């Protein structure tokens, strides 16, 4: 079943933490807009047909505290602010998942519960 659950992120709160927002003009918005343009060009531009899974972006690093969550959230927010784009942000850090905490949402079942077989329906872990 397709559970059309809508979650809202308090943009005022995350803007105070330095995240991208559609409220006002800020340097962080401009910086991620530049990154977003390149990502969207790869995903949907002329090169998209020559690349496998061109619309998938992975933010990763072997080291903690390098800004992976910050970057992933900001890039997702920046793309989501586009009128014709949707974003699925997956926190695949199995040891220290932090996206929900960072955007101040309570923990809910997620990727690990699905992979461990505790949840059968993938739509139940998309929030």
Regions found by a protein language model. Name each.
Residues 37, 41-89:
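Walker A (P-loop) phosphate-binding motif
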Residues 4, 8-11, 15, 55, ...:
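Alpha-helical context
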Residues 24-31, 35, 68-71, 75, ...:
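Helical mechanochemical/support elements of P-loop NTPase systems and associated helical scaffolds
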Residues 7-16, 20-23, 59-60, 65-66, ...:
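Histidine- and aromatic-rich ligand-binding microenvironments
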Residues 78-127:
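Phosphate-binding loop that captures ATP/GTP phosphates
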Residues 2-57:
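Extreme N-terminal, non-catalytic leader segments
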